Amino acid sequence: MSVETVSDPVPGPGQVLVAPLACGICGSDLHLVESQAAMPDLVPAMVLGHEFVGELLDYGPGTERSFPIGTPVTSVPYLDTGDGPQLVGLSPAVTGGLAERLVLQEKRLLPVSGDIPLRYAAVAEPLAVGVHAVAAADLQPGDAFLVVGCGPVGLSVIACLKAAGLGPVVAADFSPARRALAEQAGADVVVDPALSSPYQSWTQLAGAPVPMSPLMDTPMRANTVVFECVGVPGILATVMDSVPPQTRIVVVGVCQQPDTITPVIGITKELSIRFVFAYRPDEFARALDWIVTGTVDVAPFVTATLPLEAAAEAFDELRQPDKHCKILLLPS
């Protein structure tokens, strides 16, 4: 990783030029840096950063000039280009938010209002992941929730469940610092898996049924929902082993290695497993609204803010889960 001087991007048709004010570092950014270092010939260099807020500087051709110059804005990190759609901060073809200048799509801009510090609007992107995960869970009245893993994704899920008035929520993480953040996010019960079973605490709250054969006449309907927010091999299998029948499992954590499950466990328990990815534009807008209205307080999630020049230090710091959750870099 390096901080370099490059030419400013130029907004094309329907695009705008933005000066990033803050940009968060995502776990996917860490993976990309590690992959590029390990395989420089296969993974091209790119300007990272897809969690951003910035100031509108200029309009490209064919725009409607929807907002005054100087408006604080954010956007889903998706850009239409002559070479097709590109993910901002995740593609070598377009500049990401870890820069002093950034090109975005005018039609996807969202103005940032309210009395919050503008930098917190950069957290709308990871919070939107939680909005989408909760929306995908097929929630029913009386559901009880277990969130496994209290990093940025798990905290977003907890915050979104509570913002929607849902609960009880049990959160589990080995890190004391992240358990403390889970409490601040609104978790009703926080468990250290090294000391006690989060599944026991959760099923007691849920009143989960005693496992029984689906061949019995008694209808089975569980009210247990798990959000797997860790994303490492073995976690999904552990969840499947541990949950009661008919639990809904929402896989939010991004596991990038091969993993193994035993299907018969899911079959005999009639488990429902739903994999989710990112969010929809309306969910991003809802996440931003929850932040600017104070419905969700993301300030505790941000454990450090550093200048862009300290990017390498920030990436190293973020690899310490007991110390940091979300680090924002300030390009401007």
What are these regions (language model features)?
Residues 214, 237, 281-332:
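C-terminal hydrophobic helical "lid"/dimerization subdomain
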Residues 7-23, 37-79, 113-115:
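Glycine-rich beta-strand-centered segment in the early N-terminal region that forms part
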Residues 166, 230-293, 331-332:
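Glycine-rich phosphate-binding loop and adjacent beta-alpha segment
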